[in-house]
């Protein structure tokens, strides 16, 4: 009997040890769990477990390494209606097809579906994330030109729909294309392809596979589609949210690829395959121009690593199959 009890104790200790070092017993986060984030803003340790002590948030922490954020603040306390109108100054110009579509109220309403957005870190970090989100999406929807009134970076959010679109339909059994529908770029982030519409729709509770044009006709849904993309990690890519709020810790491979926390890595996430690792690039410069203007209007510094000129692009995958959303 004593021998049996001793064997049980040894087995129990072994199981606990395997859990601590990251064995195959249901890890909670990080690469061991498909890129999942810890609930409550907790840190993900190198072994894939959630917590808030230095064992989790210290060396080799994978994500959300700053620990839980302070109590959430309503986004309107960080960006007022008048500042929003100044940031997107010419979005309602008569020459912009999006005139009247991208409203402040729709932005604030959509952000409530993602309470971590603009609510992670200190006030400067929160404002910088708002500037980064609006900067990247302004590049995607810009109607500006070099000699435009108030400069090229005052013309974000001029377009809702992609110009010269195609169907963007890929045969996938999980998210089949609906008859007669096209999945071209729409909304602030210009979401495209049927599998992205399908997964986004599932996340926000709207049938975007059958009704993709809701992204171009319902302004709250439109902003939600962009925030879904922003808050969602796609392995091996972290989420833009985690990068800009410094909750992402680059791996040794990321460091070797010069992918470090900052606005430049967000550009890499969004369009690195076409824009990053090519030296000076006018598209990257345009994204930075919007970001700097918006940071100035919000009264916050730019942070480090603004470009991706020397970064190796993240590995591209066709399907967003392992998505984890920060909420």
From Swiss-Prot:
According to its UniProt entry, the function of this protein is described as: Defense against chitin-containing fungal pathogens.
Under which name does UniProt file this protein? Endochitinase CH5B
InterPro entries noted in UniProt: Chitin-bd_1, Chitin-binding_1_CS, Endochitinase-like_sf, Glyco_hydro_19, Glyco_hydro_19_cat, Lysozyme-like_dom_sf
Proregion residues excised on maturation: 317-327
Q: Which reaction does it catalyse?
A: Random endo-hydrolysis of N-acetyl-beta-D-glucosaminide (1->4)-beta-linkages in chitin and chitodextrins
Where in the cell does this protein reside?
A: Vacuole
User: Hey, which family's this protein in?
Assistant: Belongs to the glycosyl hydrolase 19 family. Chitinase class I subfamily.
Domain (Chitin-binding type-1): residue spans on this chain:
27-67
Which organism was this protein described from? Phaseolus vulgaris (Kidney bean)
EC top class named in words? hydrolase
Q: Which GO terms describe its molecular function?
A: chitin binding; endochitinase activity
Q: Which residues form the signal peptide?
A: 1-26
Catalytic residues? 140 (proton donor)
- Identify the Gene3D superfamilies for this entry: 1.10.530.10, Endochitinase, domain 2 (3.30.20.10), Endochitinase-like (3.30.60.10)
Please state the Enzyme Commission number of this protein: 3.2.1.14
Q: Which domain of life is it from?
A: Eukaryota
Q: List the disulfide bonds.
A: 29-44, 38-50, 43-57, 61-65, 96-158, 169-177, 276-308
Location, primary (coarse class) = other
Q: Which UniProt keywords apply?
A: Carbohydrate metabolism, Chitin degradation, Chitin-binding, Disulfide bond, Glycosidase, Hydrolase, Plant defense, Polysaccharide degradation, Signal, Vacuole
* Keyword Signal in annotation: yes
Q: Name one Pfam family in it.
A: Chitin_bind_1
Determine if Signal is one of this entry's keywords: yes
Cellular component annotations (GO), alphabetically ordered: vacuole
Q: Where are the transmembrane segments?
A: none
């Amino acid at each position: 009997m004593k021998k049996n009890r001793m064997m049980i104790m040894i087995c129990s200790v072994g199981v606990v040890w395997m859990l601590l070092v990251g064995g195959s017993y249901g890890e909670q986060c990080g690469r061991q769990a498909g890129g999942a984030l810890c609930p409550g803003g907790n840190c993900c340790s190198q072994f894939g477990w959630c917590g808030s002590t230095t064992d989790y948030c210290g060396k080799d922490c994978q994500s959300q390494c700053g620990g839980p954020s302070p109590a959430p603040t309503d986004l309107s306390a960080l960006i007022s209606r008048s500042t929003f109108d100044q940031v997107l100054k010419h979005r309602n110009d008569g020459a912009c097809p999006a005139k009247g579509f991208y409203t402040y109220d729709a932005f604030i309403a959509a952000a409530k579906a993602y309470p971590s957005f603009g609510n992670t870190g200190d006030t400067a970090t929160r404002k910088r994330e708002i500037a980064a989100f609006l900067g990247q999406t302004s590049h995607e929807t810009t109607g500006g030109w070099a000699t435009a009134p108030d400069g090229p970076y005052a013309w974000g959010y001029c377009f809702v729909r992609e110009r010269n679109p195609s169907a963007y339909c890929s045969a996938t059994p999980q998210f089949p294309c609906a008859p007669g529908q096209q999945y071209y770029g729409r909304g602030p982030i210009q979401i495209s392809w049927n599998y992205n519409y399908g997964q986004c729709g599932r996340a926000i509770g709207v049938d975007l596979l059958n009704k993709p044009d809701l992204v171009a006709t319902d302004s709250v849904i439109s902003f939600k589609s962009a925030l879904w993309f922003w808050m969602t990690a796609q392995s091996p890519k972290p989420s833009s949210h985690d990068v800009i709020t410094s909750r992402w810790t680059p791996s040794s491979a990321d460091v070797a690829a010069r992918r470090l926390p900052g606005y430049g890595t967000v550009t890499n996430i969004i369009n690195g395959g076409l824009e990053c690792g090519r030296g000076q690039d006018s598209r990257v410069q345009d994204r930075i121009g919007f970001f700097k203007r918006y940071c100035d209007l919000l009264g916050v510094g730019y942070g480090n690593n603004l470009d991706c000129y020397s970064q190796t692009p993240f590995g591209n995958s066709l399907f967003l199959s392992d998505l984890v959303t920060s909420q």
